[in-house]
Amino acid sequence: MNSQLLFDDLAQRGLIAQTTDLEQLIALFRQPQTLYCGFDPTAGSLHIGHLVPLIMLKRFQDAGHQGIALIGGATGMIGDPSFKASERSLNSAETVAAWVNALATQIQQLMTPHLTQPLVMVNNADWMQSIGVIAFFRDIGKHFSVNAMIQRESVKQRLARPDQGISFTEFSYSLLQSYDFAQLNQTHQCALQIGGNDQWGNIVSGIDLTRRLNGTNVHGLTLPLITKSDGTKFGKTEGGAIWLDAAKTSPYMFYQFWLNCDDADVYRFLRYYTFLSVEQIEQLEATDKAQVGKPSAQRILAEEMTRFVHGQAGLESAQRISQALFSGQLNQLNLAELKQLEQDGLPCRQLAHVSDVVTLLLETGLASSKRQAREWLENGAIRINGERWHELTLAQTFALYDQYYIVQRGKKQFAMVKLAQV
């Protein structure tokens, strides 16, 4: 892709928050270049907030450049203080090492099917662990002005909180990230670092250190921090983060998350997260606004993102579950799909046995009293495993795979019961 077209597309998508000299950057990327983004191991999985920078690496790779994914085995031992309200809890070396391996595997498994050339994977512990503390302070620390560092907004906010402040450990984080850029420039000729807009200060420090150590000019580009139209952080639900690991967030719940995206956000997220052209997204928005009824943008966003993260099989499974809950044809679900619902798709209670339906409705919270439960049954408001239910008793042989009952009240109230295995 033409360099100008690449950066024009990023701008039209709203993916450029801040950048060093844009004209210089466009000129530089007329030839194949290397860029990187860092991911600190703060958990054993990435979440959807990490998808935009990962997808950004793919956008550059599709244009003929080489992306590097840096896993912060060293920086993850400290934690980035940028715009954090309080000091991070430190994790053990064993925990961080396990998370480093998990993230490296996850990024490779996630991104490789979408790339003709795989991302280069690096771990900053590989070079940081070989530097002695005296050498680091002498050779790296001397290039940093404390006066300048404490003027950063992220540091000033912490210093303004007398109950929190900032430790020397976290204050030094910027030096480590800056050295990463200089190291990758030296070993991989890396010319650009990308990251969230909260990383701008660290990126600028890395640009300056690289110039001082290597005598080369490098660049930075930040992505907007993803928020919803109401200003709240995107990617969180009442149940917590939306993870990319299917064992932490099932493909069904992942699909539902995107499907429930607000109308005020969906077209912006299509620009950020998908590879639909800006023209296609604009046409979709115009079509949705012209027709009466539910817009199709959420469905397209959910399909694109679930396919990207969980593959076609994961998407089809999520769609089967959604359709089965809507139609009541729950016997069409396989055991793995029922386990997705058990994991995080429906409120699930585990019971030793089930025979009394009134008790079942009370245990699942679908009725608040025995009288109410009987009324729901008499009025035909209850379905069990898709069948309208009037009886007061229930045989275990009716359980799906001898384990599961899915109980429905009305159109939208669902609960799940799993029978304890003897």
From Swiss-Prot:
It comes from the Bacteria. A motif ('KMSKS' region) lies at residues 233-237. GO terms for cellular component: cytosol. One of its GO terms (biological process) is tyrosyl-tRNA aminoacylation. Residues 355-419 form the S4 RNA-binding domain. GO terms for molecular function: ATP binding; RNA binding; tyrosine-tRNA ligase activity. L-tyrosine binds at Y36, Y173, Q177. Keywords: Aminoacyl-tRNA synthetase, ATP-binding, Cytoplasm, Ligase, Nucleotide-binding, Protein biosynthesis, RNA-binding. A motif ('HIGH' region) lies at residues 41-50. ATP binds at K236. InterPro entries: aa-tRNA-synth_I_CS (IPR001412), aa-tRNA-synth_Ic (IPR002305), Rossmann-like_a/b/a_fold (IPR014729), S4_RNA-bd_sf (IPR036986), SYY-like_C (IPR054608), Tyr-tRNA-ligase (IPR002307), Tyr-tRNA-ligase_bac-type (IPR024088), Tyr-tRNA-ligase_bac_1 (IPR024107). The keyword Cell division does not apply. It catalyses: tRNA(Tyr) + L-tyrosine + ATP = L-tyrosyl-tRNA(Tyr) + AMP + diphosphate + H(+). Its EC number is 6.1.1.1. It holds the Pfam family tRNA-synt_1b. Signal peptide: none annotated. The keyword ATP-binding applies. It is found in: Cytoplasm. Belongs to the class-I aminoacyl-tRNA synthetase family. TyrS type 1 subfamily. PANTHER family: TYROSINE--TRNA LIGASE, MITOCHONDRIAL, TYROSYL-TRNA SYNTHETASE. Homodimer. Catalyzes the attachment of tyrosine to tRNA(Tyr) in a two-step reaction: tyrosine is first activated by ATP to form Tyr-AMP and then transferred to the acceptor end of tRNA(Tyr). This is Tyrosine--tRNA ligase 1. The lineage of its organism: Bacteria, Pseudomonadati, Pseudomonadota, Gammaproteobacteria, Vibrionales.
